[in-house]
């Protein structure tokens, strides 16, 4: 069954007012406390439900399907139970979506830009990850991370973020398992062909970091997570660089690429 990394929990959200679901890293290990300084936890009154990436002191990039009412963002978080001294919490001041996104089409232009209600300060556990200077190459080793489920079928959410390395694959690899994706979708295909490592429920909106650059946003994949020949699909950040930079510069009428 194919699910947007957030849709796995969507029914739960509707029934329990939790939040839209994302995915967690299956087949990974606990992240080093200092290796996810740009990772943002997006949460509501009950739980973490998505992640995002801090790209400067005032802006966060995540998936459009992570939008919800009354959410907050935590930066500098590692353990949900044992807070770091430098953790900072922010509210969204403004949220931006592609104005040319097809209405009610969750598969189209899955990216959201959030302006924080006040800037954050760099610290031991907080630092932005800049936008990519060039697109990634097939074969690149990419890093995934998040508080998503660490088991492929049942939702098992960890107290700390998990990390794993996967490979950037040719886009054609993701077409057979996901024929519903638009032919012109600006996405990346990444995973392990034999399966076992993948983002999963509650990882949605988090980063795909290839060769140290923020290249993708957790978007779409299969459920159960981590299946062979069913890699994850990630929104391609590089293709949205101009739109992001235009919004930050104050051109709120900017449109995304088709």
Swiss-Prot record:
Entries under Gene3D superfamilies matching the protein: Trypsin-like serine proteases
Entry-listed glycosylation sites: 44
Main localization category: secreted
Domain Peptidase S1 as annotated: residue spans: 25-249
Active site, per annotation: 65, 110, 204
Biological process according to GO: proteolysis
Disulfide linkage: 31-163, 50-66, 98-256, 142-210, 174-189, 200-225
Pfam families the UniProt entry points to: Trypsin (PF00089)
Keywords: Disulfide bond, Glycoprotein, Hemostasis impairing toxin, Hydrolase, Protease, Secreted, Serine protease, Signal, Toxin, Zymogen
Subunit relationships: Monomer.
The protein's name: Snake venom serine proteinase 5
Lineage: Eukaryota, Metazoa, Chordata, Craniata, Vertebrata
């Amino acid at each position: 069954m194919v699910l947007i990394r957030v849709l796995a929990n969507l029914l739960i959200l509707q029934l329990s007012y939790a939040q839209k679901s994302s995915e967690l890293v299956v087949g990974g290990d606990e992240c080093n406390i200092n290796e996810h300084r740009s990772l943002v936890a997006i949460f509501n009154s009950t739980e973490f439900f998505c992640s995002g990436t801090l790209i400067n002191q005032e802006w966060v990039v995540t998936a459009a399907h992570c939008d919800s009412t009354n959410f907050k963002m935590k930066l500098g978080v590692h353990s949900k139970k044992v807070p770091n001294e430098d953790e900072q919490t922010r509210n969204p001041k403004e949220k931006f979506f592609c104005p040319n996104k097809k209405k009610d089409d969750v598969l189209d232009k899955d990216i959201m830009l959030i302006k924080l209600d006040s800037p954050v300060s760099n610290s031991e556990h907080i630092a932005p990850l800049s936008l990519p200077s060039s697109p990634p190459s097939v074969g690149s080793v990419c890093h995934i991370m998040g508080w998503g489920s660490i088991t492929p079928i049942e939702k098992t959410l960890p107290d700390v973020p998990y990390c794993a390395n996967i490979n950037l694959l040719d886009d054609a690899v993701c077409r057979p398992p996901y024929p519903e994706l638009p032919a012109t979708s600006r996405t990346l295909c990444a995973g392990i062909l034999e399966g076992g490592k993948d983002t999963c429920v509650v990882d949605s909106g988090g980063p795909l970091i290839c060769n140290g650059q923020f290249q993708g946003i957790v978007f779409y994949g299969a459920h159960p997570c981590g299946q062979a020949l069913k890699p994850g699909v990630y929104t391609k950040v590089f293709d949205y660089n101009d739109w992001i930079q235009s919004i930050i510069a104050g051109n709120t009428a900017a449109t995304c690429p088709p």
